[in-house]
């Protein structure tokens, strides 16, 4: 009986020693079974912003809108076509019905000034709208960028766990073959290892999907990925105050109101009179006089004459309707601005609460659970090697470690997303 106990103890020590040797071997990290590499050129977030500013189709369309508005400013001084009339009446002498007439109609000068101011205000509104598009695009890029970092960090965690599970799957197999455990323990270890690799495949697929989204946002065919190696929290600065009037959205709405004010003034110029100017020059064809009219009194040469006319708007019902319609447009835009301001201020309060909750959660995992999870993993590994705990207890410890690491990654990601949302609202992207 003593000989059998000694033999059992010896076998236990051999298995434990061999398991310890396996733990000291270099970690394969599942490299032979799973390719976790993500192809692509490494780029920083600022490089993504710069690339999108040049290549993104939304930005290009916004720039074209600004250019169009700038070109339209040249239409402010549009004049009616100059009318040129030639008349020749052989039945008269050298009167005004024998000559050239140049006629030009034009609006009152204030009309052109108002129109020019309106077009300049519309150009500024287009520039503000482009800034809104830029801020929104930057927020989308930053969101995708940090989501890629988050998923890459999760993949790193799963790779480390894969190494541990693969080693202990081998240990469970040896213990089963040595008769120290049942086959169920080995099968459970192998299942855990395979499930972890399936999770790794899902995470890698999500990274590749996010990479495609980022490429679309940058409008590039070249695969790109974040330059950072580790997932870190974004440095949050000056996020405690929010002024809608100073945000990109607020400035755009204010510029729209200014443009509509200018439009109202331009519509009111319809009440102003119009002007017309005519210049006439004598043109008598001396060789063509079928009625033998005496033209001797016009023999001293040609003469010039002019005419100035003023158009008075006696029927101005259409102009009044245009002014009222422009005023309604302005009232509607003001209501929309107040509505947007209410929504943005509400969103800021919600984002602030979200950021505070994410910050508290992040501090908790950074101060306590990181070291705690590492200690659990280390102690459970030693105890399992020495046969002090069962594989089920060890797996529970591993799952607790994974849970803590993943929750810490979730906390960083949630914090970063909250910061990005506030930066988008405040226009600090």
Predicted regions and their residues:
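Acidic, low-complexity, intrinsically disordered peripheral segments
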Residues: 2-10, 16, 30-37, 407-429
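Short, charged, amphipathic alpha-helical segments
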Residues: 117-120, 183-192, 324, 391-399
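Small/polar, glycine/serine/threonine/aspartate-rich low-complexity segments that form flexible
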Residues: 32-42, 79-118, 278-318
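Bacterial N-terminal signal peptides
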Residues: 15-26
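Amphipathic alpha-helical coiled-coil segments
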Residues: 61-76, 133, 137-156, 174, ...
């Amino acid at each position: 009986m003593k000989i059998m106990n000694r033999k059992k103890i010896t076998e236990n020590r051999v298995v434990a020693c061999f398991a310890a040797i396996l733990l000291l071997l270099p970690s394969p990290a599942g490299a032979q079974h799973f390719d976790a590499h993500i192809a692509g050129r490494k780029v920083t977030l600022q490089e993504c912003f710069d690339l999108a500013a040049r290549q993104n189709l939304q930005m290009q369309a916004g720039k074209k809108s600004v250019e169009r508005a700038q070109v339209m400013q040249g239409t402010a001084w549009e004049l009616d076509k100059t009318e040129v009339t030639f008349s020749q009446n052989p039945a008269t002498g050298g009167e005004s019905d024998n000559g050239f007439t140049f006629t030009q109609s034009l609006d009152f000068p204030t009309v052109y000034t108002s129109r020019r101011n309106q077009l300049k205000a519309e150009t500024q509104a287009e520039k503000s709208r482009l800034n809104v598009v830029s801020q929104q695009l930057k927020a989308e890029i930053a969101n995708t960028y940090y989501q890629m970092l988050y998923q890459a960090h999760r993949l790193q965690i799963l790779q480390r766990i894969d190494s541990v599970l693969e080693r202990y799957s081998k240990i469970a197999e040896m213990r089963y073959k040595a008769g120290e455990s049942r086959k169920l323990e080995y099968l459970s270890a192998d299942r855990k290892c395979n499930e972890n690799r399936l999770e790794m495949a899902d995470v890698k697929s999500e990274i590749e999907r996010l990479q495609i989204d980022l490429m679309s946002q940058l409008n590039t065919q070249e695969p790109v990925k974040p330059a950072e190696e580790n997932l870190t929290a974004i440095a949050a600065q000056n996020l405690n105050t929010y002024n809608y009037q100073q945000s990109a959205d607020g400035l755009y709405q204010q510029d729209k109101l200014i443009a509509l004010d200018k439009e109202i003034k331009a519509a009111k110029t319809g009440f102003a009179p119009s002007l017309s100017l005519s210049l006439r020059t004598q043109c008598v064809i001396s060789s063509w006089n079928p009625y033998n009219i005496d033209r001797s009194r016009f023999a001293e040469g040609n003469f010039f004459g002019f005419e100035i006319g003023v158009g008075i708007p006696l029927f101005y019902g259409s102009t009044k309707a245009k002014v009222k319609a422009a005023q309604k447009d302005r009232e509607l835009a003001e209501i929309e601005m107040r509505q947007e301001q209410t929504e943005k201020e509400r969103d800021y309060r919600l984002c602030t609460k979200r950021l505070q909750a994410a910050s508290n959660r992040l501090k908790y995992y950074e101060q306590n659970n990181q070291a705690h999870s590492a200690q659990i993993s280390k102690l459970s590994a030693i105890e399992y090697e020495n046969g002090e705990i069962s594989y089920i207890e060890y797996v529970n410890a591993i799952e607790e470690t994974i849970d803590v690491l993943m929750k810490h990654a979730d906390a960083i990601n949630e914090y970063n997303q909250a910061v990005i949302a506030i930066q988008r609202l405040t226009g600090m992207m």
